[in-house]
Amino acid sequence: MAPSHNVVLLVDTAESSDKSRLRRVSLRLLNFLACRAGLGQVRWSYRFLNSSGGRCRPPRRSDLRELGPRGWEEFEDELEACWERARNCRPSSTQSSRAQLLQTALMETLADFQWDRPDITSPTKPTLLRSRRGRIVAADEPLKDDSPDNFINPHSRNSIFLLSSCPHSGTELGQFAATSGDFSTQKVMDKLLPKSLQKIVSSKRVRVYWLDTSDWTQFGSSSDHSGYWTMVELMHQVEGRILPSESILGSSCQKAKTLPSFSVPPINIPFESVLNYLIFSEPDYQLWFPRRDGILFLTGKDGTKQLDCAVSLEPVSMIQKLSTSLMTIELKGTMQNCNLPLAGLRVETWLLHNSDCVQLQKLTKELMLKELHMIATVTLEDDVLPRTGILSPLSETAAVLNVICSERTLGLDNLHVQGSVHETDKETFSDLPDIVMSVLNHVYSSEDNTLAPDFPVPEWIKQELSQSSRWTSSVTARWYPLSGVSGASCNLMESFRLINAASSNCDEHLKFDQELTNYLSEFYQKKSVDDAGLGVHRENQKKSGLPRTPVRQKMKTLPRALQMLNAARLNVKAQKADSTLPVPNEKNSQMKRRSSGKQDNKPKQLKPTEFQSEDGLISYIKENYEEAVSLVDHSTMTWARDTLTTIKSYLKSIGSEQIETEAIDKVKLLFKTSKVIRQNYRNNQDKEVKLKECQLQVFLRLEMFVQCPVIQMDSDELELIIEEITDILRIVSLTEDPLFLTKFLEVDVLTQYIASVPKILADIYFSLGTQIPEVLVLVLPSDGDDSIMHEEKSVKSQPSTSRVPSVAPIGAETDQLEDLRTRSAKKRRSTALARHRSVAESSQSFRQIEVPKRQPNKENVQSNAVVVLEKLKLPLPAQPQKDAEAKVRRNLFIQETRSPSKRCSKMPRSQSVSAVESLKRKRSKSHDGSKDHHKLLTKKVSETPVHKQTANRLLLRQIKGRPSESNSNISIVEESPEKEIRDIDLRRSPRIKQLSLTRRNSSSFYASQPKSRNLERVNSATQLQQSRERPGSCLISEVKTPKRLLFGEVLGMISPPTTKRSRRILDMVNPVYKTPGKTPRKTPSKNIPNFEDQSGNMLVKSPCTPYTPRTPSRTPKRLKTPSKGSTERKKAAKNLGKLFSPSKPEEKSPLKLWGRRSERLAQMTPGKDGSPYKQSVCQTLMEVKTPQKLQRLESKDFRTPSRTPTRSNNTTPAKQSMQISNTPRKSDLKHPQEHESRGPSGYILWTPQKRILASVPHTPILQTPQKPISASVPRTPVCRTPQKAILSSVPSTPVCQTPNKAILTSVSRTPVYQTPQKAILASVMSTPVYQTPQKPVLASVPTTPILKTPQRSALASVSHTPSPKKYIMKELTVAITRMRECTPEKVLGSNLSSSATPSSALKSFCSEKTTSVCQTPKKSSIALLKPCDSLEFSGAPERLMDSLCSNKDSTKAETACTVPSQISTQMQNVINAGECTDSLSQTSVSSPSIPFTDKSLSPDLKDALSDVTSSKAEGVTIVSEKLDSSSMDSQEATDSFINSSQTEESIDISEARVVSTEASELKMKVLITRKPSGSGVSYLPTTPKCLGNVCSTSTYGLRCTPDRRQREAAARLGTPEIPAKFSTPKSHCKMIPQSIYEVELEMQESGLPKLRFKRTDSNSTIDMDVNKTPKISRKRKGDESPFNEKWCSKHAVRTEPACVSPSCVRTSHYTPGKSGIQTFICQSYTPNRCLSAAASPSQSDAGVPWTPSPKEKLSTDVINSWPRKKKASALCTNLLKCDKIPEYAEEDGGDFELEGVSKLLEKSPVIEQQSKVDGGTFGLRSRKRVFSLVSPTKETENPVKRVCTFNRHEDSSTATHRHQTKEEMEIFSSDQSRSSYLSSSQQSICDDVFNMSDFTPPSKVPKNPLSACGLLTLTQSPLLYKGKTPSSKRKEKIQDVFSDGDSDHGTPTLKRPTNPAAVSDDSPFRKVNPLRSISKTYSRKKLIT
């Protein structure tokens, strides 16, 4: 059966002016196709598009359906609805050209339909089928035209008709393609039909037709049609056509009067003719309308031919008299106003073409101009009379010739056709010439002789013949092909015969009537039998048809199943009867062969009896063979058949018993093997003879198969012969060519043997390795075991002429019928009778339908408008039909699996078998995030589940009917057979979903995006910690998940007071993050609306973040980290460190992981205060976990696909909180809860850094520290990435904002997210800094950085133009966030600190919010931001501080979020941006002077700050990852701080608390719970040295190594030649260097984590006292290269990119020549492990405080001497947060761990002392290179090394920001300011430390650096500091340490607490669990030069 025609109408609803026109065009088109192909052969569907940019809903029915009234009604209804929507909706804001929109619509249409699905129809379909809609169609009724099946081009069987207006003029074409200038066809082609789309069209065998719906009357007066002809040419190139709607509607003539007077009225050609020509294949079309040649000449008055040219003529109608004779056209004269239709003349129309004759072209052109027609005399060679013609010009090369048919000529035609002429007819033409009359008489007489005598014809025959005036009795034999239309059917003729037979009294004419009827009946029955494939009947069997018996009548009324069964039974009967026939009918075959015309050329065929003996026969056939080979024109197939027949006849004549066996032996005497043939023709060049012999050998063997079926019983022999045939055919192919072989097989072999030995032919094709032709495929029998057709056992009868395979008998009829019944029950719908292999095998051999991988953003596409816009270019997967499961014919060919969510939603629970075993048993453990508990039953499903191939009912029947199969080993997986492991792990049943807090809010059963394991663990860990924090609460959950294994102890040690609040907050928030795979039932967005209550932020309601409760705010799931693999996920639980390892492609970007980890830690270890801040942080983290929702909320703002939506900060409560803090001005300093209630405007940015929010128990300060986005800024997608987007609409800059994320809260409006890859920080906020961090820490932002080369994008130098404080800070935050996000951490992941770029971006942002940082990811340099000289962050800080103060009782420790008063006013200065140059361009942030004066802070705030600072800075958790507190501070102080870290890092930091050692000073003791991302850039107001000039860093080319990329990103942002300017704000608060603690967490065999707490960042302690050292800044010597320092020898192995957070942008961190900053924190070595006498951070003495090694030991040698412990958690910056860590005083002078680490820019004397390394050697030497950032002089002053210390001067909140945005700031901070530099270096160090997972500690024990949150938790943990002196006693030390270190929370500068408990190995934190490490230990990879 011919395949059906698939037609899709793609209707443009943009123009609804002429609705009726569009309807009529569509209807006439469908009507035409139905008439042409048959009503039952057309399947259609429709799609709508709006070329003006609006959206159209998909139709209710998305499948291809048969034509019917109901479908048309639905089409009209939906079309009207689309018009209505198009009229009401406003055009899209995106400026997409019409061509682009059409291209997208074509892509979707091609992907939505199954174009290649075969049409499965039962061969026993009843005569009438009543569809479900009541339409009755006759199955055997040929509804299509009598055109051959191949009339339609195979490609046109799949057609897309685009119904839209086509551009006509050049102007319209330019608007269509949105291009200007020259519109070449190629340009338009690239816009509309790019090569990718053309490939899809070609692969799916689809033709695209453009149906121009525009009214052509509108263009009649226009002379510019260049656009239209360009489109025509374009469509021709893709084998498409443009169809004018006028040709279909036929309205051209009616409206011709509207055309201009000079134009020629169009020809009224039937639209069917136009469509036939345009749609159907050219070769076949030419067969139907053959061209004929003609001669056109014009004779002058003098008789000379003035014009004589050859022309070609094509008929317009098939009714015309077609002839190949020559037509002569003689032009006679001209005429005007010719209207043939009005004249009522019958005409034949021909199209005349000539493109060569210039004279003719001139003539036609002249005729067109003068509106003239020419009269011509037309003469045909076979015409009796000449005719009159009218020539009408169409164009210069074409004209229309209308030949008038007069009545006389019509009469002549009738005479020819009718075949009977009466005397009256002759009289009628008596006036004709005698010669004509004689010819006519001759014709008539010949007709009379051939016709039967005039006899009465039966009435019914007269009626039939009367239907056509041209039919005569001679046509009756050709009646059958039209019988279906005329009504003469087999049954009808049989009934006539029976009726006539009943009459006994027959007259003479009645007898003739009866005889004619009998003949016709027999003829039709025979034809029907042959077509039905029932075989050839015996000659004497007159009546082969089946009488219309009552049984047969009854069958008509039976159900379809019974009809099929009975039909099959009858077929078996017929086959059984046929099998009794003699095998070949030699007599008939010989007679036929003898009758052939070629028989004369053959030697005389001897009779079998003429052979005297067998030898005579053999010699005869051999001679005959030689003659056949020599005769090239000899018919090889006929010869082979004759030979076999002769042999068998002889054997029969001698009475042989085994005729076939003996015949085979005789024939084999003629066989030659392929080897023999090669040898014989080795030297023979006669190719023809060789080919002839090969063909003879093939035909001999095939004929033997046919005439000697017994050989087919021997499978071995059969296989050998087939192999030999194959070898011979290969010789043919080699001798000629494969094309010759293909033709030989298809033309000569298939046509003769396809019906007799199809399987053998298939085997031959298979052996050749070529594709089996479709014709053969249709005939091949089913291979099913239950098939009734076992051809190998059946005796072959005569070859069947039908292609429909006949059913061969295989035993007794009863057995066959039983088999039939069984099969019918089993395969009710599988249509086994159809021999299509794909159908017949459905139940036996399970088809291995390839299950495509889950569509990346399939759900996003449905839920996110932005994503849809971005994905329009991609073909959308076909939507499986709802009823597909119930229909086998549908199900077999569904190429795409249904989405798991849909399947699960429909699947009964009883069938919802999970792919993981023991799910219930381990349900209690499911929320812990450990995927090890889930063990896949099968790693790979090799076969598609049965239920995907057959309907359930059919499957059950098959299982019952074939119990043997039910015992098969195939296990039926009732859910999608193949899923990524992460999907399986993430999936939870609805009940389990509710149980787990880690669940994300997602309506889908499966996570739309993979969720980071790290994030999961962090969240779960934080939850556990919170649960433990509750006073008196015992561990609720066992420490068995990786989170608990890694952080269990830490969590358990969380201070109880915060536990309840955090738990409550978490509950309220419904932590999305808890289950990476799952979203909590309540999506964060849902919670977000409630955020007013919790955090005071209506994040969800902010316009930016549309509230989509189902979309988890954490979109990370959707954002698949490209590198993340399912296998890694399996191992995640086993090795959490691996997850954190950036190098592992499977795992998410390390930054993300770190950030998450830190978040977990932050949540886990809130502060000792137990401030709600931690809780809020946890909430934030949780919310961050549900970035999807955030994304959804923000998706509106983001036009880019949801790459970074995961980071939607708006969603995350933390972001909201941050927003609150961002607008402290708006929010009173009252209790943070009040701020929370304030709403979007007063969003407190709950950033872990600033525990200000802590006081607000419900607002998750840290919840998504990295991502916290100012909820108030709904528009800014920056917030989307929790890390990055802190931007709140609140004008005031959120001091507390998540440092990493949106430092620039004000920037909230600008969607940071807009173009992740290319988003430019143009207007600081405008371009989402965070666009898509490659490694979004929390947000599962796509790992690919939005800024594709964020590293390269450098923030243009930021001028110090002041901008509104709020906005500036916001913008800074946003910029930082964007930078972070823009520079994916992976990109930064190379040693380049991720923050480097962000920090620079932040700097630039800080410098000027308005200035667009332009983070063009790759190379676009960030536009210069005008430095915000007075970026007043103070307002926000004050309010923040006030709010913090108000809450200080509960959140003193949490005041980290608060920015010191210094920061407030001078943050503006800090924000004054340095400049970030393009790739590796040096980022110089000059913060002229950022005096952090308490002036900006209200007295209350100051008090609060002092209290906070005095309270051990324990609450200070600097989110150093993305934006350290330095970033916040630097927002005010320097832009460099802003770039401290990428958003992801910031997210990692759970909280930062600022503890002022002295009442007047605010020291940040950063306990970073954040992820281990690099420490934020320290804000060093005290280092005025750098103020003067910006530290310059030389740009270097990027390294390919991943670990270089981070460094590279940082390097880009830094300008080495310019020393970092760090204006030291003259704030009273000292910048306390953040102490970074390296926490090595080893998993013990017991499953409990063993934590070794090590202080690593003492290196970059800076005296934050601005007043004391306001000008202290480290300047690099003029020629000093930041890379001239040696790397720490311990980092010999390069870290994997993900592990190392981007190092500071400082050139000191850069590796020379590697353009990437490779900052490794040697301090990250575990103190216990390091025995260096130089007070290396690895000091093992528990009682010894962790102090930076003496400055004399800062040398690289000392560093190199350290034990090779490469992992250090630099994120412990906020360890001071715990009051119990008093020992961290900076006074010790050396970082307990950072001894080998070069100092950061020395803001404080400590830094200077330590940075004594020549050239300001950066104390932190990562990997054998020492960075020389700090001038040696300054370094010497500071004994403690500073990697990148936060300026204590910066607010603790800023420090927190810096921590969070540490990575960002690192990127930004390079060279921007000394403090910035320090902070950046710290960040880099912190990043390195935390990312040190890449490093293998010298001990070879994988130690996981603990994230900031973890460190914070550790420091606060009572276990760690039991019996230790309170941190208050150590204020001085801490202040000293943090003066530089605070700002650099991540810097290992912090000395080891002298408190022995802190250092002692007894502390659970100090104990390293050898089994597991928090982060993967990586050996540093070698640098790639």
UniProtKB/Swiss-Prot annotation:
Pfam families: Treslin_M (PF15292), Treslin_N (PF21854), Treslin_STD (PF21855). One of its GO terms (molecular function) is chromatin binding. Residues 964-974, 1105-1114 have a biased composition (Low complexity). Phosphorylated during interphase. Cdk2 promotes both phosphorylation and formation of a ticrr-topbp1 complex. Interacts with topbp1 (via BRCT domains); interaction is cdk2-dependent. Component of the replisome complex. PANTHER family: TRESLIN. This is Treslin. It comes from Xenopus laevis. The lineage of its organism: Eukaryota, Metazoa, Chordata, Craniata, Vertebrata. The gene is ticrr.
